[in-house]
């Protein structure tokens, strides 16, 4: 089973992904961590975004083929990246579910983004202006949407877990 999370920086994707990974004993693949490791390695690549996603796809597929549940944690901004995650699941012959994480309270979202700028690691994320001007395309297919505005991290994770359980209950076979 591949659980593909998407959403702008600061909406709570990684917090939810970590909680789900613990709850489901799943592999958590965070594209931001992959991209940071590539930058810190000194390797020169034409597009760090493309390289980070490609590494994520490969690691996800390897783990799915081992029978693990995988949680892909990335901005996942375009139909092309969303399709690529779904293709990973198809190649591994497992189900996949897409979950978009949003924060509908603009002030809360901005506060989250700005609070991360002074914290380690050195690459703690984009500025608010970079977040709001980012190329993030609307979804063109069915997916689950979870709004993290006004709820705690624990509540957001519980909402995500319940949404996945509801989704699974509509499947004929349990996730693998």
List each language-model region with its residue ranges.
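Small-molecule kinase domains that catalyze NTP-dependent phosphoryl transfer to phosphate-bearing small molecules
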Residues: 115-159, 167-176
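Glycine-rich phosphate-binding loop used to anchor ATP phosphates in small-molecule kinases
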Residues: 50-96
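Hydrophobic anchor at the beta1->P-loop junction of P-loop NTPases
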Residues: 5
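P-loop (Walker A) phosphate-binding loop of NTP-binding proteins
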Residues: 8
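Walker A (P-loop) ATP-phosphate-binding motif of ABC ATPase nucleotide-binding domains
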Residues: 2
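Conserved substrate/cofactor phosphate-moiety recognition/catalytic segment
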Residues: 11-66
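Conserved nucleotide-binding/hydrolysis micro-motifs of P-loop NTPases
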Residues: 33-35, 77, 102-108, 150-152
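Conserved phosphate-donor/acceptor-positioning beta-strand/loop module used by diverse small-molecule
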Residues: 92-112, 146
């Amino acid at each position: 089973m591949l659980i593909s999370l998407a959403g702008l920086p600061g909406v709570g994707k990684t917090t939810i992904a970590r909680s789900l990974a613990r709850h489901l004993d799943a592999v958590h693949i965070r594209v931001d961590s992959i991209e940071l490791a590539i930058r810190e390695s000194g390797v020169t690549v034409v597009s760090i975004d493309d390289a980070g996603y490609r590494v994520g796809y490969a690691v996800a597929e390897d783990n799915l083929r081992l029978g693990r549940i995988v949680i892909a944690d990335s901005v996942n901004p375009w139909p092309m990246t969303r399709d690529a995650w779904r293709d990973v699941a198809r190649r591994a012959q497992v189900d996949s579910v897409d979950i978009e994480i949003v924060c509908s309270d603009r002030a809360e979202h901005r506060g989250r983004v700005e609070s991360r700028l002074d914290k380690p690691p050195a690459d703690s994320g984009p500025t608010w202006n970079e977040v709001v001007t980012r190329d993030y395309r609307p979804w063109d297919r069915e997916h689950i949407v979870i709004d993290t505005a006004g709820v705690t991290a624990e509540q957001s994770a519980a909402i995500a877990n319940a949404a996945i359980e509801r989704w699974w209950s509509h499947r004929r076979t349990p996730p693998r």
